[in-house]
Amino acid sequence: MARLDTLKNKAEFDFVYRNAQRFFHKDFVLYMLKFSSIRESYPLRQQRIFQSIQSRNAKLHLGLSVSRKIGKAYMRNLIKRRIKAIAYENCADFKDVIFLIVVKEGIREMDFATLKNNLLASFIKMYNAKKTRNIRVLHQISHYAG
């Protein structure tokens, strides 16, 4: 069983955008969709998209959106590699979930340790959250507790 899988096309990204919980951080926006929250009342097209994601048998699915405003290709790729490494390292803690991360400009100046602490704290907060649609963080999360 593959441990980490990425979202492949626009339809999968749109499915997560429409149905996921949101977490707002000053350097990124995190969308999280648990498999258990998927309802059978979704339209047939959305059910097919979800089934195609689920059929890839990964514990954690990850989508990354890094716009050109962030920097040149080497900077965007560096950010994507860092986020994938953090997710791959910790995917055993988060099962049957889809995370989608939309990166903001402030992430460029962030070093790997700070990025890891902020992402993991956000992952944990979202994964353990009640069913709220939007969660906001007004200050930077200082360190990962766990």
Curated annotation (Swiss-Prot):
Gene3D superfamilies: 3.30.230.10. One of its GO terms (cellular component) is ribonuclease P complex. The keyword Cell inner membrane does not apply. PROSITE patterns: RIBONUCLEASE_P. Keywords: Endonuclease, Hydrolase, Nuclease, RNA-binding, tRNA processing. Transmembrane segments: none annotated. GO terms for molecular function: 3'-tRNA processing endoribonuclease activity; ribonuclease P activity; tRNA binding. The keyword Cell wall biogenesis/degradation does not apply. Consists of a catalytic RNA component (M1 or rnpB) and a protein subunit. Belongs to the RnpA family. This is Ribonuclease P protein component.
